[in-house]
Amino acid sequence: RYKPLAAPGGISPMSRTSWSWRNGLNKPEIVMEGGNVADHPVLQTTTTPDLSLISTSADLAESLEPFYATSAATALAARMAAKIKTVNPDLSLLSVRGMMVHSARWTEEMKRIGSINDIMSICGYGIPDEKIALFSNERYATYIFENELIPYVRKDGSNTYNQLHFNDLPW
């Protein structure tokens, strides 16, 4: 008998993070379901189909097969990005990415990790909400401005304001 290693709402034990980097970079920006690992008294930790996602198989004898980890999470993120781009064809891919990040939230389990810096380096901004990302143009005030600016610069050993853009809103 085995039990899932990660708690519901937690990150997959197979997740790659920037936690050990300690340089302020956040990896990943979002987290998607990548399956879980089973804790077994004899096998120790192992993957199992019961805790994995499923997809169609190339093996005709087995129509479905489990897949997990980065392969599963990346496929789900790509699916969500494609759906956002389909609903909002005028958005750039950078804006699609921004919509995914903007819709993300931490679960209660993720919030138990500790400091905000630790959560950001392990979970990024959290799990994106597909409905918010897909329909935020219609139901929420979402302002997308694509341009380049450098808001802060380092001068004399401290951060200083640099650039700021003001935009007139249409209401």
Could you tell me what each predicted segment is?
Residues 119-171:
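Secreted peptidase-domain scaffold signal
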